[in-house]
Amino acid sequence: MTLKMKNILFISGMLILFLLLWSVTLFADVPKGFTGYGETTAISPDDETLVFSYYHDGDASLYAVPVDGGEATLLAQPEEGTSYVNPAFSPDGDMIVFIKQWQEEEQPYGELMLMGAASGEKRALTSGYNLITEVVFSPDGGSLYFLQAGVFQNYSDIARERPHDFDIHRMDLHTNETEQITNKEAYDMSSLAVTPDGEELMYRSYEDSDRIIFMSMENNRETSPVPIFDVASEAPILSSPALSPDGEQVIFSDVASKDENGTFIYEGFRMDLDNYEAEQITNFQEHVTEPVFFHHSDRLIVTVDKQFAQRESDYQYWEVSLDGTEQRRLHIEIPEGKEL
């Protein structure tokens, strides 16, 4: 076997492994009875509040806590067998949009929900049996952009069933009218974001390789920046990219090293969109994912999985300075009084 073929097989195997592990957390696919933090968080526009999901016996409720940690407040608790996940704030901080997830006959579903940040009043924005996975506000707060999958299946005998045939949709919040703005039926889409000027969408996609894509709202033209950095996995993974509030940087997670068992260790990397140069900014020696920017300071919240590649994740939330010199764990008290 030639060296080139060995490299191709190694890279292909690595990407398949990543997709298998990624599918474990996608769409609230958590072990039955799981209790603990969800993977994603949202920071309010005034940088005062962190909203997150917390699972009780497999069902996720939404909580809010000061960004420095402390006692959490229950925002929304779903009915049994349902989870509230992937929250996002409106630009003025008055509203929170999130995904309501559930399963029927092993088929997952996801619908859009909107809630008043202060009142807690919530309403469904979509109905039926859709497969919506992520949602973000437009910069003016008048629209939502969301990812919707067309099928839930496996395209390989060794892969788990998961959402495929993705496209991006837009909802006008004044009329509730929805339009599909891409026609890709993509194998994978995630990490949806809107540039500050509202002229482009950013998302992560996987077809033949992992890519961060910027798509023009005017003509659907796409650009795909390739970060310049030393990656330990032979080929970039570019997991969970997050766009900075000024639109000038992207933080993403990628393989930095391996542990003694050969498991990939994912750290946070910062890419400058002017020159695509990237540098590692975390050193947890764990699995770092889902970075979220503060709006008015050079800080991030990242999620660290202490049990990556195991049956159950053990997520913690950490505050990290943008230059990577400081990091601090958020200690949160869930209303039952137990600090986790």
Predicted regions and their residues:
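Sequence signature of WD/YWTD-type beta-propeller architectures
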Residues: 2-340
